[in-house]
């Protein structure tokens, strides 16, 4: 029986830890102190680290953790990611035999060019590509690239549990309501997620089914999101990537 825990780190990061009674795998452990405190208090050995992209809040623990636990570190091919033992690319798989896990690697560029996601045992570890009711900013990629990555994630089974790297859900819901405020599924999600945060509980993991019905960044094929893009751009027939780009631009303006 595996336990999945989102460990809060920094202001709003989550370090995802999947473990049994002896071994653990961690995703994007930017703060090694947070992770090691959890592991050591339970007598867990760190078998592997999975890194989604090169940003420091996702990679800052790599060097210390590899020295401390002699763990494998899987990451995309980028010299800015330290202490990597195994480079991964889309189409690869990662085995963690200590936990009986096999995870597929998906290339999900957009937030960064090197971004990958990991999928296995009904769980998606998507870093900063997909958030609760949102998606990552386009720091390196473009709208076509990110929309293709999100389409790939949306094609996973609806029961897939979505394990994002940041607790941004309530802010993302606030934005989503400005363009999709009549969506009853979104309003029900807001009720549930606000109650969770009021009790200091995470809003994650969500499910792909929930994201498909409430997240505007997975709904850019839908008629109401296309209508929003037409109003924003004045284009009579925008394609899916253009619709996504209009939603992303609106979110960037809303963020200020």
Curated annotation (Swiss-Prot):
Regions that span the bilayer: none
Broad class of enzyme this protein falls into: hydrolase
Residues that, per the record, bind Zn(2+) 1: 53, 55, 111, 128
Necessary cofactors: Zn(2+)
Alphabetic keyword roster: Hydrolase, Metal-binding, Zinc
CDD domains: hydroxyacylglutathione_hydrolase_MBL-fold (cd07723)
Cofactor, how bound (note): Binds 2 Zn(2+) ions per subunit.
Catalytic reaction annotation: an S-(2-hydroxyacyl)glutathione + H2O = a 2-hydroxy carboxylate + glutathione + H(+)
Quaternary structure note: Monomer.
HAMAP family membership: Glyoxalase_2
Protein name per the record: Hydroxyacylglutathione hydrolase
């Amino acid at each position: 029986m595996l336990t999945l825990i989102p460990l809060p780190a920094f202001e709003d990061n989550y370090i995802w830890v999947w473990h049994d009674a002896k071994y653990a795998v961690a995703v994007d452990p930017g703060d090694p102190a947070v992770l090691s405190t959890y592991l050591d208090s339970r007598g867990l050995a760190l078998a592997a680290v999975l890194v989604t992209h090169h940003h420091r809040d996702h990679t800052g623990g790599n060097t210390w953790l590899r020295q401390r636990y002699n763990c494998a570190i899987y990451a995309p091919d980028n010299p800015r990611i330290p202490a990597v033992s195994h480079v991964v690319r889309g189409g690869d798989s990662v085995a963690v035999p200590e936990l009986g896990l096999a995870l597929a690697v998906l290339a999900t560029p957009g937030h960064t060019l090197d971004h990958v996601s990991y999928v296995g045992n009904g769980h998606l570890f998507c870093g900063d590509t997909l958030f609760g009711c949102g998606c990552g900013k386009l720091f390196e990629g473009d709208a076509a690239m990110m929309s293709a990555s999100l389409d790939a994630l949306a094609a996973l089974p609806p029961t897939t549990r979505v394990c994002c790297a940041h607790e941004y859900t309530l802010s993302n819901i606030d934005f989503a309501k400005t363009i999709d405020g009549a969506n009853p599924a979104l309003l029900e999600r807001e009720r549930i997620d606000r109650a969770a945060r009021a009790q200091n509980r995470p809003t994650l993991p969500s499910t792909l089914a929930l994201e498909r019905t409430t997240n505007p960044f997975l709904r850019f094929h839908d008629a109401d999101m296309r209508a929003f893009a037409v109003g924003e751009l004045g284009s009579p027939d925008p394609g899916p990537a253009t619709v996504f780009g209009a939603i992303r631009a609106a979110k960037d303006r809303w963020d200020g």
